[in-house]
Amino acid sequence: MRSDIVEAMATTRAIHIETEIPGPRSRSIVERKERVVAEPLSLYLPVVAASGSGATLTDVDGNTFIDFAGGVGCLAVGHAHPRVVEAVTEQAAKFFHTDFTIVPYEVYVTLSERLLELAPFSGPAKAAFFNAGTEAVENAVKFARAYTGRPAVIGFEGAFHGRTLLSLTLTSKTHPYKAGLGPFAPEVYRVPFPNEYRDVTAEDALAALRRALLTQVAPETVAAVVMEPVQGEGGFIPAPQDFVEGVRALCDEHGIVMVADEVQTGFSRTGRMFAMEHFGVEPDLMTVAKSIAAGLPLSGVLGKAAIMDAPGDSAVGGTYVGNPVAQAAALAVLDVFAEEGLVERAQHIGETIRGRMSGWQERYPAVGDVRGLGAMLAVEYVEDRATKRPAPEIASRVAEAAAKRGLLLLKAGIHSNCNRVLCPLVITDAELDEALGVWEESLDAVLA
């Protein structure tokens, strides 16, 4: 290849900024939004989307960003993947909706078959589909309660499971999610989650769980323990191996259903199709959503057949659950994972990002911790490493500086003092390097 072509390829940037951020058209639309959209739907990033392709997003002002927000983890296959667009178009031309329990359709059955082939269950398993991650969690608890005949549920500090009543009760962050919205669901109990950086060991957390079964709730009344294998909104905190094994053992000892919430961790985000595969531990039920359908509203509960069959006839469901257009997208997503090797790609992305983040940790005292699994990685900012006092203002300022430079970054953590990576797994090496360079420039601007 000619040297001038190689040089041009090397200097081509995915990011293209034409205006200040936000630009005039974005500001105008946001002003209209303020007049007609409910105030609680506040905006994290004040840029208005016009189109997306792969790992990039272009706003209405013509600015193109590299997208590390990824629809909050919904876009493992990227924006507008051609295979997904084709599948959605084809299904939409046939029919949009019937309600599967009224007039069933094959795509629901096919998606169940394909997901269960991938899911980490050794015996007979079944699936049920819903619209959003929060619905999947609520229905997983329904399955567990029906199977065990018990009412209580145990969750963990730092968890996020959704924003409807039961899932919000399980969620462990008051602001902005819970403050002023109670009362919450009864029979929900919470114990610490391991966090090595915050000096909560797996042994500590397991001891707290055992103590809760003595002091808070009798084990014979507990239907389920609901756990994220990597806490998402809590700050991308992976569960230690011995903790996951310990939870499984306690569930087995007391006949409790172990629910793995894989809404954010699933579909290759951690370098395995599902994060529970890292631990070699089989859950009883698993919730999935987000990247399952490339951003279309679809979620599911996958689990052991005996548990999934426990509720009575029509005890779970809903008018729109398992929409055929979203399920067609999901089948295309699974094809893309297989054809483009996105599980392995997530591992490569994770290794690349972790290497850069580790360098930042050495360079910037405010980068207190680097953690995650696969491509699901975050940095935690602190005021100083001695006290580890959370520094949420740094996470906010870095995200703002990055957006102005063309990188969309999200925050995370119960103190909102983390920046996290949820980039499309189809991101190219050049785009990844460019994005990490912008992140580093933003750190320099904020921390210098």
Task: Describe each PLM feature range.
Residues 2-448:
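Conserved N-terminal phosphate-binding loop of PLP-dependent enzymes in the Aspartate aminotransferase
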